Amino acid sequence: MSSQLNDPTPIPAQSSLSFTQGFFLLGQLSVVLLIAAFIKFFIFGEAPPPPSRGLSHRSATHRRSNSIFSSAQHDGSTRTLREKPSNSNVLRPVPSSATNTRSILRKTYYTAIPTNPSSKHGRHRIHHSSHQPESLDWFNVLIAQTIAQYRQTAYLLKDSPTSSILNSLTAALNNPEKKPSFIDKITVTDISLGEEFPIFSNCRIIAVDDPNSDGGRLQALMDVDLSDDNLSIAVETQLLLNYPKPCSAILPVALSISVVRFSGTLCISLVPASTPPLDTPSHSPSPPTAQTTTAGRSKREDQTSGSHSHAGGSSKEPSGENPPKTSPKSNVAFSFLPDYRLDLSVRSLIGSRSRLQDVPKVAQLVEARVHAWFEERVVEPRVQVVGLPDLWPRMGRTGVRTGDDSETGSNVPRSSTAADASGSARHEDSSREPEVLRFGSLLGTRPPFDLASRTSSFNVETGDLRSRSMTREESNGNLSDQFHMPGSLPGSGVATT
């Protein structure tokens, strides 16, 4: 009994770590596991594929397919990171399958099926598209804004001695190399740039077989329609009879040409920089003139003197002899199909005392000449090639769009001269009403037409400025349309009857 009381009871062994210490260690272990998982799956893991830009229910035909050159490009990128590239191997070549017509149509989800494979009259075979024709309402708005800006700019520069459209047309019409000797100086008496805008519609993309490009080339066809009675030009000149002696007889002639309606199919295509230039057939080479002969003789003399000086050892390198070479640029070519429609209204007035009005034969000759001029320039197979501008962002062309409500810090440091100029120009624009660009030159008084027709007549009379806008007045019981141009010089006016 006593021995049992003397035996000590065994004490259970206590843990060396408390609950708090164990919880802290467990938290550290979990943080280490999270960091390891983050490093493994987020830093060293593969990049996820880029999200699709299209809708989730896009059909299988509109899904992008992996390029067959993806693996080759991936290997090339890995190799260029390890190896030092040479100067001639920096720019990677573009695969031909990525720039041909089929690849472009596939990547832009446009279907072009050859439904008309037969060729006609030796022309390129056209592959018509099964894609539905598209409307061009947005394009019409942009074109209308551009034309409106051109009209306003031409009106504001009407008094400029160098940039005026009147001076440009006068110089073009009086070109001595093209104007016959029996026609006196041609004077432009009236110009109207119109009020309406062309309407483009029914745009479609076709594939055309072209031997100069791999896989052919793409061409945009769109219908264009313009109906504007105010698109006109009026000129005056004199026919000279040089037999039996020069200027033995003079016959005054006045013409007014208006474009009533134009409709046709516009073709637009891109011409790459590597494509050889298009050859446009010309009728006959221009005969050598005195200026060209003198220029050729002086050039030969310069070459001869340069060779002698080079032989003597005292020659210098000519500066600026060769024109600077520019890099080839991509061009856009546009033309009209031969099935266009151009309706003109030609009015004529021939004679000084006993006048002949609206002679049908004169109208036919003028219309035939205008059609020939148009077909020689922009009707298939002739095209107009225009160089595309440089679209690379440059600081010299950087501007800031200013607003009326808020002023940004970048547009604050403007000169007071520019602000005053813009304010005065804005004040002039608000005080004017340039509905139609119509102005005349300062010439002598001509007897008016004995017709009460539309505003396309072109007689010029001297008078004072009576109103701020173009108005019509009736005086002396006769119907006389007196046009006054706001901002024109005193003593000028355009009168029509």
Swiss-Prot record:
Keyword annotations: Endoplasmic reticulum, Lipid transport, Lipid-binding, Membrane, Transmembrane, Transmembrane helix, Transport
An example Gene Ontology molecular-function term: lipid binding
Subunit structure: Homodimer. Component of the ER-mitochondria encounter structure (ERMES) or MDM complex, composed of mmm1, mdm10, mdm12 and mdm34. A mmm1 homodimer associates with one molecule of mdm12 on each side in a pairwise head-to-tail manner, and the SMP-LTD domains of mmm1 and mdm12 generate a continuous hydrophobic tunnel for phospholipid trafficking.
Compositionally biased intervals (Basic and acidic residues): 76-85, 425-435, 463-475
Membrane topology: Single-pass type I membrane protein
Residue ranges that the UniProt entry lists as topological domain Lumenal: 1-22
Residue ranges annotated as Cytoplasmic topological domain: 45-497
Similarity annotation: Belongs to the MMM1 family.
The keyword Transmembrane helix belongs to this UniProt entry's keyword annotation: yes
Protein source organism: Aspergillus fumigatus (strain CBS 144.89 / FGSC A1163 / CEA10) (Neosartorya fumigata)
Signal peptide: none
Biased segments, Basic residues type: 55-65
Transmembrane stretches, start-end: 23-44
Feature: compositional bias, Low complexity: 305-315
Biased composition (Pro residues): 277-288
Domain called SMP-LTD: residue spans: 132-389
BP-aspect Gene Ontology terms: mitochondrial genome maintenance; mitochondrion-endoplasmic reticulum membrane tethering; phospholipid transport; protein insertion into mitochondrial outer membrane
GO CC annotation: endoplasmic reticulum membrane; ERMES complex
Listed name of the protein: Maintenance of mitochondrial morphology protein 1
PANTHER family: SMP-LTD DOMAIN-CONTAINING PROTEIN, TEX2 PROTEIN-RELATED
Free-text function comment from the UniProt entry: Component of the ERMES/MDM complex, which serves as a molecular tether to connect the endoplasmic reticulum (ER) and mitochondria. Components of this complex are involved in the control of mitochondrial shape and protein biogenesis, and function in nonvesicular lipid trafficking between the ER and mitochondria. The mdm12-mmm1 subcomplex functions in the major beta-barrel assembly pathway that is responsible for biogenesis of all outer membrane beta-barrel proteins, and acts in a late step after the SAM complex.
Pfam family, one: MMM1
Compartments in which it is found: Endoplasmic reticulum membrane
Domain notes: The SMP-LTD domain is a barrel-like domain that can bind various types of glycerophospholipids in its interior and mediate their transfer between two adjacent bilayers.
Region Disordered, annotated ranges: 51-97, 277-332, 397-435, 460-497
Annotated Polar residues bias: 66-75, 86-97, 408-419
